[in-house]
């Protein structure tokens, strides 16, 4: 490994120690490399504004940074173990091509605020993707709730048959959940949309850095003012972003659980498209719902990433090398979470209900609540009506139909009044 920015003359670096220090940092930095380049361009512009760089030097740096970005995208430049991290790779390339101008690029900044700003830009993009996918899932669910509002579905509590419900209610529940997930991702975006570049190692520098320019140039909503807080926010903002992602993957896990049950032979309420299933290596008869099972497992990866960062943050103020480990947590957590969420809209759009199976699972006892409420409306104290309905639950369905039960469920949000217009207005507000 070459290009150690911190190496002192005459001090040897033990290879094993350096390998331990670097870990898989340079591989993870491939996620942040283009963001680091963008921030380096903005930083160079700020240095020119205060006279550290000439216009000619700025032009050369900007050109080389653009070329490096192009080479990285095309594969002509590979960020690998020749470098300690993405920061040293950028400085090495600029120094090789431009000499002194490349050696000036790090004036007024530290790798601490360098990775902070690159990570912050990366998190903003990831949160926008969480919001977009949550919005897309909500749209599918709203459309299907409208189309299948009157399709009877058995409602369960404790995984036991409970009351008559509808596909519309099932879909409306997920629509509202993912609208909230999009709102949460957008709110978290606003939290992290603050520029730490120019805070250096956490104590500022003796230069009048043009932080207002880098804030505007990089598209941040505001300046992160305190250098101390800039360091305190590392890990805190990553944790908030993972919590926003986790809200979506938690709901994904519960959808996947429903579908795991509903596609089983014991329920057989739902048929999945063939591309969402696999087979067995030994049992020719099997058609396994592996996609939804791995979707269900995804939240564990996101929760593990969140837990790792929570444990890392048992630190005093200031920068500590422990925080390097937060990179792997967010990269792996978001990779798993977004990969699963990407598949969800199409899966939901293409699953098929089996109306005959749904209807056959609605038994007489599932009308008992209707009987009790109707008696209460007629003047019988509800607790007495409840006891009478419980005693006669086996015959509660006589003369009743699932459609009749759904039509009577008029409380706001229930089957006869899904209030999809309210949910659609909330969805439209996300656009």
Swiss-Prot record:
Keyword Lyase annotated: yes
Lineage: Bacteria, Pseudomonadati, Pseudomonadota, Gammaproteobacteria, Lysobacterales
Organism: Xanthomonas campestris pv. campestris (strain ATCC 33913 / DSM 3586 / NCPPB 528 / LMG 568 / P 25)
EC number annotated for this UniProt entry: 4.3.2.1
Signal sequence annotation: none
Lyase as UniProt keyword: yes
Main localization category: cytoplasm
Gene3D superfamilies reported in the protein's UniProt record: Fumarase/aspartase (C-terminal domain), Fumarase/aspartase (Central domain), Fumarase/aspartase (N-terminal domain)
GO molecular function: argininosuccinate lyase activity
Protein name: Argininosuccinate lyase
């Amino acid at each position: 490994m070459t290009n150690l920015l911190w190496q002192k003359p005459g001090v040897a670096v033990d290879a094993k120690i350096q390998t331990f220090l670097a870990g898989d940092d340079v591989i993870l930095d491939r996620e942040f490399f283009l963001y680091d380049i963008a921030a380096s361009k903005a930083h160079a512009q700020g240095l020119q504004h205060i006279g550290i760089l000439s216009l000619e030097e700025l032009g050369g740096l900007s050109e080389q940074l653009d070329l490096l970005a192009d080479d990285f995208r095309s594969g002509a430049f590979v960020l690998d173990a020749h470098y300690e991290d993405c920061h040293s790779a950028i400085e090495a390339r600029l120094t090789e091509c431009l000499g002194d101008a490349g050696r000036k690029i790090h004036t007024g900044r530290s790798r601490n605020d360098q990775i902070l700003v690159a990570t912050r830009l990366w998190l903003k993009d990831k949160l926008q993707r969480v919001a977009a996918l949550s919005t897309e899932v909500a749209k599918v669910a709203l459309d299907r709730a409208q189309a299948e509002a009157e399709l009877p579905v058995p409602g369960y509590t404790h995984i036991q048959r409970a009351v008559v419900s509808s596909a519309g209610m099932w879909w409306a529940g997920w629509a509202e959940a993912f609208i909230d997930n999009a709102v949460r991702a957008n709110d978290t975006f606003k939290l992290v949309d603050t520029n730490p570049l120019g805070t250096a190692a956490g104590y500022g520098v003796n230069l009048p850095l043009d932080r207002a320019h880098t804030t505007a140039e990089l598209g941040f909503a505001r300046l992160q003012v305190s250098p101390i807080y800039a360091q305190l926010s590392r890990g805190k903002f990553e944790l908030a972003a993972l919590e926003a992602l986790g809200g979506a993957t938690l709901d994904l896990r519960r959808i996947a659980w429903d579908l795991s049950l509903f596609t089983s032979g014991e329920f057989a309420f739902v048929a999945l498209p063939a591309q969402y299933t696999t087979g067995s290596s030994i049992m020719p008869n099997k058609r396994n719902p592996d996609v939804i099972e791995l979707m269900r497992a995804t939240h564990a990866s996101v929760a593990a990433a969140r837990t790792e960062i929570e444990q890392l943050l048992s630190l005093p103020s200031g920068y500590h090398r422990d925080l390097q480990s937060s990179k792997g947590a967010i990269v792996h957590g978001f990779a798993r979470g977004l990969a699963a969420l990407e598949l969800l809209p199409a899966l939901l759009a293409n699953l098929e209900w089996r109306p005959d199976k749904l209807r056959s699972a609605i038994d007489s006892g599932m009308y008992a609540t209707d009987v009790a409420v109707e008696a209460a409306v007629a003047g019988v104290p509800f607790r007495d009506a409840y006891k009478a309905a419980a005693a006669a639950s086996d015959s509660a369905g006589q003369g009743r139909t699932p459609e009749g039960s759904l039509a009577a469920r008029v409380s706001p949000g229930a089957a006869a009044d899904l209030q999809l217009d309210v949910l659609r207005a909330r969805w439209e507000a996300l656009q």
